[in-house]
Amino acid sequence: MIKNYLSHFLPVLLALDLIIPFLLAPFYKDYNHLTQVMSVLGNSKAPLHSIYNIWLVAFGVAILISTLQLYPTVAQVSSSISIMLFSVIVIYAVGGCILSGIFSVGETKSLETLSAKIHGYGSVIGFLLLTLAPLFVGLYFFKVSNGLLGILSLICFIFAIVFFALFVMADKPNYRGTIIAFEGLWQRLSLL
């Protein structure tokens, strides 16, 4: 029952994951969507950090539940694609959402505390693997003979890789003052 209910609201939850930072940011003085990652809204100095951290955990749990429904559907077509897609989504839900919500990061990306290290490594691994999801979705669509959605998924995969690469490059000193330095923008675009 809850799985069927959740599948109807998953698109809303995915949209909220991008919208909630825009709703919370006005309460955090000097927060910049273009240059700062969303996790900064969960650090202890952010006025509404508890709301953001609770959201991340709830969102991660919702993704896990919906993935349990997705797995058998994809497995009917290909068990290997299903396992790979399930794995990357679960790792993102746990590392990029649940652990990131439980273990806050500081205002900067320095990994000085155990909490910041767990958050940093969990979210990097989660986001990195999430970039592979459109590839597996594309393979699934090709298997079910839906070439158009397969091609669109592969295009999304290419964009995800490009945006993730820009996200990783954004904090490097060589790119300071350039469009590549828009770390927050690249993070958000990699999630689309």
What are these regions (language model features)?
Residues I2-Y31, V37, L41, K45-L192:
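Hydrophobic, aromatic-enriched alpha-helical segments typical of multi-pass transmembrane helices
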